[in-house]
C-alpha cells in the first residue's frame, strides 16, 4: 500500500472515530458522549441491533446515549432505560457485550406499554416466585442464614441484590442457579427476569430458555407475534 492510500485510509478511520451522531432504524438518535475504545465498532453494533430487534418493539425509544453518566460508578451500572432513552456505558468488552446491553434496555422500554401481555394473568410472576422459592432452599442448604421473606418479593430490592452478589457471590450464585435461572442476574427481580429472558430469546439459546422458563418464553413469543396470546 502506497503512502497516499495509507494516508487516506487512516484519515477515514480518524473521521469515523471522532463521529458523534448516528441513527438506529432511521428514527432513533444515537449520540456518543464519551469516546468508545478502538476495539468497539459502533456501526456494527447498531446494524446488529437493527437485525435482532423487531422494529415494532423498538418504538418506545427515542434516543441512545453512549458514555459515562452521573452516579454510575457507585451503582456499578452498565446501562439503563429512562425517559424514552437508553443510556449505555462506553466501557465495553466487545461488540457483543454492547449489543447485549442495548437489547436489555429495549426490553425494559416495552414493559409499561406492553405490560398487559407481559405481566397480566400472573403466569410470569408465578414462575418467577416459584424459582425464587427454590433458590431460597438451595442457598439455605449451602449453610447461609437467609430469610424467606426477601425471596418472595418480586420487585427490585437493592439490599437483596447486594446479598446475592456480595455475600453469596457471583460464582456461587451461578452454580446454585444453573438450570433454575438463565443467568444469575435474572434472579434479581421480576423485571430483570423478563429482560434477561428477552435477550436470551433474541441473542442466545431459545431452546434452553423454553426449557428453563417456559412461561417467560411464551410471553416473549406473544410479544414477537409468532403465536397468538391464547
PLM regions with names:
Residues 124, 128-169:
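Low-complexity, serine/threonine/proline-enriched polar segments
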Residues 16-95, 120, 140-148:
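Auxiliary, metal-adjacent structural segments of Zn-dependent hydrolase domains
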Residues 1-37, 65-69, 99, 161-178, ...:
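Non-catalytic architectural context of zinc metalloproteases
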Residues 99, 105-126:
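Catalytic Zn2+-binding segment of zinc metalloproteases
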Residues 41-48, 52, 134, 159, ...:
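Exposed alpha-helical structural elements
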Residues 44, 59, 93, 97-105, ...:
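Short, well-structured alpha-helical interface segments that form or flank functional binding sites
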Residues 3, 37-40, 44, 151, ...:
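Alpha-helix boundary/N-cap detector
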Residues 156-230:
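Pan-zinc metallopeptidase signature
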Amino acid at each position: 500500500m502506497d503512502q497516499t492510500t495509507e494516508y487516506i485510509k487512516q484519515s477515514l478511520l480518524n473521521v469515523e472515530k471522532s463521529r458523534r451522531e448516528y441513527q438506529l432504524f432511521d428514527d432513533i438518535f444515537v449520540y456518543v458522549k464519551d469516546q468508545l475504545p478502538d476495539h468497539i465498532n459502533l456501526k456494527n453494533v447498531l446494524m446488529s441491533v437493527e437485525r435482532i430487534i423487531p422494529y415494532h418493539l423498538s418504538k418506545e425509544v427515542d434516543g441512545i446515549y453512549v458514555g459515562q453518566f452521573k452516579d454510575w460508578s457507585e451503582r456499578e451500572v452498565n446501562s439503563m432505560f429512562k425517559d424514552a432513552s437508553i443510556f449505555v456505558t462506553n466501557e465495553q468488552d466487545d461488540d457483543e457485550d454492547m449489543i447485549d446491553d442495548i437489547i436489555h434496555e429495549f426490553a425494559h422500554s416495552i414493559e409499561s406499554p406492553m405490560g398487559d401481555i407481559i405481566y397480566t394473568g400472573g403466569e410470569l410472576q408465578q414462575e418467577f416466585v416459584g424459582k425464587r422459592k427454590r433458590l431460597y432452599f438451595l442457598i439455605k442448604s449451602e449453610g447461609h442464614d437467609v430469610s424467606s421473606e426477601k425471596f418472595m418479593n418480586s420487585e427490585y430490592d437493592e439490599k437483596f441484590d447486594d446479598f446475592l452478589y456480595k455475600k453469596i457471590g457471583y460464582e456461587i450464585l451461578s452454580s446454585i442457579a444453573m438450570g433454575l435461572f438463565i443467568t444469575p442476574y435474572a434472579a434479581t427481580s421480576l423485571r430483570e427476569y423478563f429482560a434477561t429472558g428477552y435477550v436470551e430469546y433474541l441473542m442466545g439459546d431459545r431452546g434452553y430458555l423454553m426449557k428453563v422458563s417456559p412461561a417467560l418464553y411464551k410471553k416473549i413469543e406473544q410479544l414477537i407475534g409468532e403465536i397468538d396470546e391464547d
